C-alpha cells in the first residue's frame, strides 16, 4: 500500500511539474505577442497632440451620462411590476429622468443609450398591459378606486372602511366625460316638401338604328404658304440685328424704347430676348451701371452640345411705370428702332371689302335663280 501511494504521489508531482513547465513556456510567447502588437500600434498611430482639458471634461461627462442611463435601465427592470399600477408614480418619475438625460445627449453613443432606455421602458409597459388584458383587465374595484382618487373629495378608499361615505365631484367627472359622449338632441321634424308624389318612370326608348358610315372623303390639300411667312417677331429681330451691325455698341434703352407706343417697346424687348437666347447679342454692364448691347457671332451647335458654351438667362421686369422714366431718360430722336404702323385699319378695310363681295355674289346668285324660274314658267306656258 505504501509503495502504491508513493507511486501515485510521484506521478502527480511529475504531471504538475510538466504543466508548470508548459505554462511557463507559453507565457513568454504571449507576452512577446502583446509587446509586438503594442509596438505595431504605437508605430501606426501618429503623434497626437495633447488632449485639452475641455475634451477631457467632455469625455468625463459622456461617461457619466452613460452610467446614468445604465442605472436607469436597471431601475426600469426592477420597477417593471409597479409601472402600470394606479397608485404608483414610478412611470412619471422614470420618464422625467429619461427626458432630463435626453437634454444632455450630444454624441451617437449617448443617443444609442437613450434609445435603449426608452425601448426598455416601452417594452416593460407593453408587457404589463398585455398581462393585465390576459388576466381580465382592470377589476371593478380598481376602476372605482381610480375614480375616487381622481374625483373624490376625500382621500379614503373603498378598501379602507365599508361604512364611510365618499362624496364625488360629479361636475368635474361630467366635464371630463362629456367630450366622449357628445350627442345633440334635436327636434323630430321632416325636411322637404309636405306633398311628395312618386315620379313616373320614363319609358325606355328602343335603340335607334344607326346609319352606316358613308364613303371616305379626302380633304383638300392646302398649301402652307402662311407657315413660310415670317412672323412679326422675326422681322423685329432682323431689323434690330441690322441696327446693331451698324452702330456696334448701343445702350439698351436707346435700342428698345419706342416713345409713342408702350406695346412696341415691349415687343422690342421680346425680340432682344430672342437675340440674346440665340447668342447673337451680348449685354454688358459698365462701371456706371449702364447696360450696353453688342452684336456677336452665335456659337456653333457642337459647342453647345458639348457644354463648352452655356447660356445664362435672367428675368427682367418691365411695365408702364418703367416705360415712362425711360422715355424721359432718352433724348428725343435717339431711338433706334423705327415706329411700326398698325395693320388694324388695313385689316378692317379688307374685311369690309370681302363682306361686300360676298353680298354681291349672293345677290347675283339670287338674280340668276329668279331668271331661271321665269324661263321655266315661260316654257310651261308655251307648252
Swiss-Prot record:
TM stretches of this protein: none
Source organism superkingdom: Eukaryota
Record keyword DNA damage present: yes
Residue pairs linked by disulfide bridges in the UniProt entry: none
Tissue specificity: Not expressed in seedlings, rosette leaves and floral buds.
Chain segments carrying region Disordered: 1-59, 198-231, 355-383
Biased composition annotated in UniProt, kind: Basic and acidic residues: 1-22
Sorted UniProt keywords: DNA damage, DNA recombination, DNA repair, Nucleus
GO CC terms of this entry: nucleus; Smc5-Smc6 complex
Compartmental location: Nucleus
Biased composition (Polar residues): 355-372
Bias kind Basic residues: ranges: 201-212
Single GO BP term: DNA repair
Record's subunit section: Interacts with SMC5, SMC6A or SMC6B. The SMC5-SMC6 complex is composed of the SMC5 and SMC6 heterodimer attached via their hinge domain and from the non-SMC subunit NSE4A or NSE4B.
Entry similarity comment: Belongs to the NSE4 family.
Physiological role: Component of the SMC5-SMC6 complex, that promotes sister chromatid alignment after DNA damage and facilitates double-stranded DNA breaks (DSBs) repair via homologous recombination between sister chromatids.
Protein name (record): Non-structural maintenance of chromosomes element 4 homolog B
Amino acid at each position: 500500500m505504501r509503495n502504491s501511494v508513493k507511486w501515485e504521489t510521484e506521478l502527480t508531482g511529475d504531471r504538475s511539474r510538466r504543466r508548470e513547465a508548459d505554462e511557463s513556456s507559453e507565457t513568454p510567447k504571449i507576452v512577446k505577442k502583446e509587446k509586438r502588437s503594442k509596438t505595431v500600434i504605437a508605430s501606426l498611430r501618429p503623434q497626437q497632440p495633447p488632449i485639452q482639458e475641455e475634451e477631457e471634461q467632455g469625455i468625463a461627462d459622456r461617461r457619466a451620462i452613460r452610467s446614468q442611463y445604465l442605472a436607469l435601465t436597471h431601475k426600469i427592470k426592477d420597477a417593471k411590476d409597479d409601472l402600470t399600477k394606479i397608485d404608483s408614480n414610478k412611470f412619471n418619475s422614470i420618464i422625467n429622468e429619461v427626458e432630463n438625460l435626453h437634454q444632455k445627449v450630444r454624441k451617437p453613443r449617448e443617443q444609442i443609450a437613450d434609445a435603449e432606455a426608452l425601448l426598455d421602458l416601452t417594452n416593460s409597459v407593453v408587457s404589463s398591459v398585455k398581462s393585465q388584458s390576459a388576466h381580465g383587465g382592470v377589476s371593478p374595484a380598481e376602476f372605482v378606486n381610480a375614480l375616487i382618487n381622481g374625483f373624490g373629495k376625500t382621500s379614503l378608499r373603498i378598501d379602507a372602511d365599508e361604512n364611510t361615505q365618499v362624496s364625488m365631484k360629479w361636475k368635474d367627472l361630467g366635464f371630463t366625460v362629456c367630450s366622449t359622449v357628445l350627442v345633440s338632441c334635436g327636434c323630430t321634424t321632416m325636411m322637404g316638401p309636405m306633398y311628395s308624389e312618386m315620379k313616373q318612370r320614363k319609358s325606355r326608348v328602343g335603340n335607334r338604328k344607326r346609319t352606316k358610315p358613308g364613303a371616305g372623303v379626302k380633304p383638300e390639300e392646302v398649301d402652307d404658304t402662311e407657315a413660310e411667312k415670317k412672323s412679326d417677331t422675326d422681322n423685329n429681330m432682323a431689323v434690330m440685328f441690322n441696327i446693331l451691325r451698324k452702330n456696334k455698341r448701343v445702350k439698351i434703352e436707346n435700342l428698345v424704347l419706342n416713345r409713342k407706343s408702350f406695346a412696341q417697346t415691349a415687343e422690342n424687348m421680346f425680340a432682344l430676348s430672342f437675340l440674346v437666347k440665340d447668342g447673337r447679342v451680348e449685354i454688358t454692364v459698365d462701371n456706371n451701371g449702364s447696360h450696353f448691347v453688342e452684336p456677336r457671332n452665335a456659337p456653333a451647335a457642337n459647342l453647345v452640345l458639348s457644354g463648352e458654351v452655356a447660356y445664362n438667362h435672367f428675368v427682367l421686369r418691365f411695365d408702364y411705370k418703367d416705360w415712362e422714366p425711360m422715355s424721359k431718360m432718352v433724348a428725343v430722336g435717339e431711338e433706334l428702332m423705327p415706329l411700326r404702323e398698325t395693320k388694324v385699319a388695313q385689316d378692317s378695310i379688307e374685311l369690309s371689302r370681302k363682306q361686300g363681295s360676298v353680298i354681291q355674289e349672293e345677290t347675283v346668285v339670287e338674280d340668276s335663280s329668279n331668271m331661271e324660274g321665269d324661263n321655266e314658267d315661260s316654257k310651261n306656258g308655251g307648252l
